[in-house]
């Protein structure tokens, strides 16, 4: 098997036989656009090698938009959680199809991707979000390889922008106490309990909102994280089991939180008795006046308002989780215990997320060691 080369204008192309068509006639593949004959010969040799190993796949001539919509509807819808599917769908329809949809699958080049990432950076989109889009496209291309629409994953040849690690925004203990003091004065006791549970346990927002009374052992001071709450775009709420086995966990809680939960339970029971049958009792620890889960949007609005009112550092709700972990590590708690409380896959993940805290602790350890050595010298003298 050999290739045939020709020069057209300033570029070289080659043609090679790739097999026989169903009618017995020769099937050929032509590739062009090479600056030199040497480049064309190299590409031709690689193609012939693939054909010889029966590894050559003719790239699909379908538009990326058609293939991506098929992937979204038939593959992702059946395999992803609703929350992940909705996020993927939004990114694909709003960002990726407008960018790459008109291009045929086999004609996408690294330069297309690089230019798109540059455009997104010019729009001031974060490296984290661009990396998220990159991950979606890599996954899409991986699927196209699996169903033999392409030979290789072009997104493996392009790097997304570098993500610079930022220090987690956390509250001091003084800020926590000031915020909780303001929250406790609010008419709606639910929000105060949400913040209290999040700060004292490190639970995620969906985990706090999905807690049921049967998940809490008030006698022994334990709570079980068994499910997560998600509100779909249509406004419906869903309860799911945690993503991983480690997320499904048992968390010890202090006596002060136990007492607050007991008070909250009494207030809730009083409300249920008062409103009667209109209360849809799902057994939730945190529920609105009708018994259904608090909407995350309502929580965000309340959180932002109370931050302003209590004059504390502006953070996200998720940063309460970081605050919990940071305080534990600063107190000298073993990283494995912190990892278990947070539901991380392993302690190395916790070390990576909170490396800035452990770095400070390393410096403190070095100082303590030096002080111990000085003390030893004094004793010897």
How would you name each of these model-derived features?
Residues 162, 166, 170, 228-231, ...:
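Catalytic-site neighborhood detector that most strongly recognizes the C-terminal catalytic loop/helix
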Residues 127, 131, 146-211, 218-219, ...:
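Basic, Lys/Arg- and aromatic-enriched nucleic-acid-binding interface segment
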Residues 57-60, 72-154, 165-166, 186-188, ...:
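N-terminal core-binding DNA-recognition domain of tyrosine site-specific recombinases/integrases
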Residues 215-222, 314, 333-355, 363:
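Short, polar N-cap/turn motifs at the start of nucleic acid-interacting alpha helices
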Residues 123, 181-191, 201, 251, ...:
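Short, basic (Lys/Arg/His-rich) helix/loop patches that form interaction surfaces
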Residues 185, 220, 233-234, 238-248, ...:
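C-terminal secondary-structure termini that scaffold catalytic or DNA-interacting sites
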Residues 1-7:
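Short amphipathic beta-strand and strand-loop transition segments with alternating hydrophobic
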Residues 8-13, 18-111, 264-281:
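N-terminal DNA-binding module of tyrosine recombinases/phage integrases
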């Amino acid at each position: 098997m050999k290739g045939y080369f020709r020069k057209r204008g300033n570029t070289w192309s080659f043609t090679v036989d790739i097999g026989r068509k169903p009618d017995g006639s020769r099937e050929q593949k032509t590739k062009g656009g090479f600056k030199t004959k040497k480049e064309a010969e190299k590409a031709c040799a690689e193609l012939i090698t693939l054909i010889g190993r029966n590894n050559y796949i003719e790239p699909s001539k379908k538009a990326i938009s058609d293939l991506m919509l098929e992937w979204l509807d038939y593959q992702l819808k059946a395999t992803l959680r609703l929350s992940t599917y909705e996020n993927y769908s939004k990114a694909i329809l709003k960002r990726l199809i407008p960018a790459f949809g008109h291009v045929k699958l086999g004609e996408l080049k690294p330069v297309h991707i690089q230019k798109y990432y540059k455009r997104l950076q010019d729009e001031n989109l974060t490296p984290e979000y661009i990396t998220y889009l990159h991950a979606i496209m890599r996954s899409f291309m991986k699927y196209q390889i699996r169903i033999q629409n392409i030979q290789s994953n072009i997104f493996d040849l392009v790097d997304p922008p570098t993500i610079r690690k930022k220090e987690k925004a956390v509250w001091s203990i003084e800020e926590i106490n000031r915020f909780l003091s303001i929250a406790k004065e609010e008419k709606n006791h639910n929000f105060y309990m949400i913040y209290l549970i999040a700060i004292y346990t490190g639970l995620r927002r969906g985990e706090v909102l999905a807690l049921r009374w049967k998940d809490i052992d008030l006698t022994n001071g334990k709570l079980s994280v068994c499910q997560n709450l998600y509100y779909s775009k249509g406004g419906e709420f869903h309860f799911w089991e945690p993503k991983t086995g480690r997320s499904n966990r048992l968390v010890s809680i202090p006596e002060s939180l136990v007492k607050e939960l007991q008070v909250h339970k009494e207030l809730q029971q009083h409300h249920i008795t008062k409103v009667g049958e209109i209360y849809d009792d799902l057994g939730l620890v945190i529920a609105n006046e009708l018994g259904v889960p608090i909407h995350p949007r309502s929580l965000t609005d309340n959180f932002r308002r109370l931050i302003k009112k209590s004059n504390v550092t502006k953070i996200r709700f998720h940063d309460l989780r970081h605050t919990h972990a940071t305080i534990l590590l600063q107190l000298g708690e073993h990283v494995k215990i912190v990892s278990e409380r947070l539901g991380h896959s392993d302690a190395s993940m916790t070390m990576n997320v909170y490396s800035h805290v452990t770095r400070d602790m390393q410096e403190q350890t070095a100082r303590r060691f030096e002080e111990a050595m000085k003390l030893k010298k004094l004793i010897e003298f």
